[in-house]
Design a protein with these regions (language model features):
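Accessory DNA-engaging acidic/polar modules
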Residues: 1-104
């Protein structure tokens, strides 16, 4: 299993959560059928606009999809945050230490 640091995490103008890996790309993430997508231009994984799931649940889904693709994504000391409220950031950070595909 490869490990990659998450360069940045944010919420875009459409309300979608995105996660940008430092070095890995995921052009085939759609094959996991998890509603997680790869944005080629922004070089990031992203969720649909949350409906029933919270942003934390979508973060776990993105991390799980990457795990199924053979990469463990980890939040690092240098991870940048964009458009994420402090309480949501804390919740995402708290969830990042859990098993990548547990209880999504």
């Amino acid at each position: 299993m490869q490990t990659d640091t998450i360069e940045a995490i944010g919420i875009d103008q459409e309300g979608r959560l995105w996660v940008k890996p430092a070095t890995t790309s995921f052009p085939y993430i759609y094959r996991e059928a998890m509603e997680v997508h790869w944005d080629v231009e922004r070089h990031c994984l992203y969720s649909p606009t949350p409906r029933e799931w919270s942003y934390v649940a979508w973060f776990k889904q993105i991390i799980c999809g990457a795990h199924y693709q053979g990469v463990d994504l980890k939040i690092g000391q240098t991870t940048l945050w964009s458009g994420v409220a402090p309480d949501l950031r804390q919740a995402i950070e708290d969830s990042s230490g859990l098993s990548p595909c547990a209880e999504i």
